[in-house]
C-alpha cells in the first residue's frame, strides 16, 4: 500500500513539476514579448527579406548619384557578405539554394560599394554565376535594373507601353486586373520604360564580367516554368509587334498616358509610408521622378525618398533594408498571444495594442479594391502604419478576432463599431469561388501570368486557403455558422475542395503546408466542423506524421517548387512548431503525444530572454521568388502555443473556442 501511495505521490509531484515548468516558460516568454512593446502600445518587429532589397538600396543611391554614405555602405556590405551562401552565390532564404538574380544584385552592390572583383568572396560569386550560365539568366526585374544601368539594352526586357494606363477595364490587360503589388510597381516602371533613362552611376561600375557573352547582345527572356507555351508564344508575338510599333505611337497619346500614371501615383503617394507602402514601388517612383527631370527637392520625390530610408535597419556592424514594415500584423498577433497567456500585465498590454489599432482602421478611402466592389464600405486594416488604398483581408480578420476576444473575455468596450465595419468589409470582399484573396476580389485573370513580364508568376492576387481560413475564422468567431451564413458555408466549401490528398492545405503567405493547415484547422474548428470529419482527421494525422525527431516541426521553401506539391522536411523552427501545435489543438488533439513532444521542444529551445532564436525564413512574399523572416514570429507564436496548451489542459472541454 505504501508503494502505491508513493507512486501516486511521485506522479502528482511530476505533474506539478511539469506544470510549473510550463508556467515558468509562459511567464518568461510573456515578459520577453512585453519588452518589445512601443510606448504608444504597438509592436513592430524587424521584417527581413533576402539580399535583394539591401542590394537594390545601394544601387538606387548610385543610380541617383547621391552622396556616398561610407559608414552605411560598409554596414550593408557586411550584411551582404554574411548572407552569401556556401555555394558562392546568394539564396532567397537562410541556407537556401543559389538564386541567379539575388546573386547578380548582391555582387553588383558589393562592387559598387568598393569590393575588389579579385576578393575571394567576389571570385566565388562570379564562378557560381558562370557555372549556372551567367547573368543572362537573371529575371525580368533584374534585367530592368541592368537596362537602366546600361549593362544590357532595352531589348532584353519586355515592352511595357505606358499607354496601358489608358485602356478600358474590359480590355484583356488593365491595371486593375493585376495585384496591388504588381500594379503599384508597374505604373512607375512603365514611365521609366517609356523614357529609358540611364543611371548616373558616378563610379561607372558595371558587371559585364558576370556574362558569358556580350550583355548588349542579349534578347528577351525564355518562357518561365509556370507559363503555358501557347499563351507565352501569343504574348511574345504581341511583344514583338509592340516593339516595332511603340515608337510610332502619337506623342500626345504618350504624354496623356504618362500624365495618367503620374496622377495614379500621386493620388496614392501615402506620405513617408510610400506608394503601396512597400520598397519596389517606392524605389521605382523615385527613379520615375528623376527620369521626368524632377530634382531631389520635388515634394513627392523627396517624401518618398525619406520613406525609403525609414525601412533601414541599422545595427552596430550591419545594416539592411526591409521590404516594408509590419506594425499592424505584429500588434494584432502579439495581442492574441498575450490574451492567450493572460495575467495582470499581459491583458492590459494587449488592450493598449488593440487601442492603438482602432484609428488605423480605414473607414473613408475607397481603395483600388472598390473598382470591383463599388458598393462596399471601407472597413479594413492595412499591414503597415498607413496604406489607405490597400488594406488587406488577413490583417483585418486577425484584428477583428483579437478585438472580439478582448471584448468577450474581458468585457472591454469600445471595439463594437470597428468590429462591425471590419466584418462588413470582409463579407463584401468574398470572391465568387467562395474564397478570399489578400487585397482584391475576383482577381482571376490567370492568363496574365503568361505575359513575358510575369516570369515571377506573381502578377495576380487570387483567393487562397490561408486568407480564406482567416476570414471564415473571423465570421465564425463572431457567431456565424455554415447554416446561418452563406459566406461561411461557401468559405468552408472552398476549403474542403482545396485540401491536398495527404491532408494538408497550401500556405500562400506562410511556409507552407504547415502554415496553411494551421490556418484551415482553426477555421474549421471555429465554424463547427466536427473533429471526426475525415477532412480534419486526415489533416491532424498528416501533421503528426511529419513531426521531426526532436519534437519540433519545420518546412523548407523548396515545398513551393512547381513540380512538387507537398511538404519538404527542414530543421525544426519555433514558429512552425507553434503553428503545428495550434493546428493539432484546434483539431481536438491536445492530448496527442505529438503535442506533448512539441511543447517539450519549445520549452527546451527557449533562450535566456524567454524567447526563441530563429534564423530560418518561415514566411512567404511570393512563392519561389521572395521569402520573409518575421523577427516577431519566433517570439509571439511559441508563447501562444504554450499558453493554449496550458489553458486547454486546465479545462474539461479540450475545445478551442476562438478562431485562432
UniProtKB/Swiss-Prot annotation:
Its EC number is 4.2.1.129, 5.4.99.17. One of its GO terms (cellular component) is lipid droplet. It is a peripheral membrane protein. It is found in: Cell membrane. Catalyzes the cyclization of squalene into hopene. The active site is at residue 394. Pathway: Secondary metabolite biosynthesis; hopanoid biosynthesis. It comes from Bradyrhizobium diazoefficiens (strain JCM 10833 / BCRC 13528 / IAM 13628 / NBRC 14792 / USDA 110). One of its GO terms (biological process) is triterpenoid biosynthetic process. Belongs to the terpene cyclase/mutase family. It comes from the Bacteria. GO terms for molecular function: lyase activity; squalene-hopene cyclase activity. CDD domains: SQCY_1 (cd02892). Keywords: Cell membrane, Isomerase, Lyase, Membrane, Repeat. This is Squalene--hopene cyclase. The keyword Lyase applies. InterPro entries: Hopene-cyclase, SQ_cyclase_C, SQ_cyclase_N, Squalene_cyclase, Terpene_synthase_CS, Terpenoid_cyclase/PrenylTrfase. PFTB repeats lie at residues 73-114, 419-460, 536-586. It catalyses: squalene = hop-22(29)-ene; squalene + H2O = hopan-22-ol.
